[in-house]
């Protein structure tokens, strides 16, 4: 049993490393993620201790997910994100609830890994500008795709085991 548990945690660790390797983010995207999180944390430092705020950006779009203890922090996150330069649009999906458990976060990582693997197998992920974030089984898809690519990608995401919902924040190519 100890060996299986060790293997499980090793797989979780390796999958997290691989997810990071597949990022298409620019330096500006990473900077906006860090600045937004700092601004939110500095505004209400005592409340943020009980918060789980995740910020992802892609081509100027900023996605905020996670859990916060009060509704006011949801609004604050959007306000702070909108003060940054080079932010085209803010998508705030924060939820007022307790922080996600370790098991839930691990499951979300596995869902993201599974989706990326399936997209690569079908050559839908190759050289495409997309970013996938999973929170509580809800998959957020960011990037730029043509309509047909988007439909195929969303269908694949929705049929992936463990996915509760798929939310497209994709900008369609014309």
Which residues does each predicted region cover?
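N-terminal targeting leaders
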Residues: 2-7, 12-174
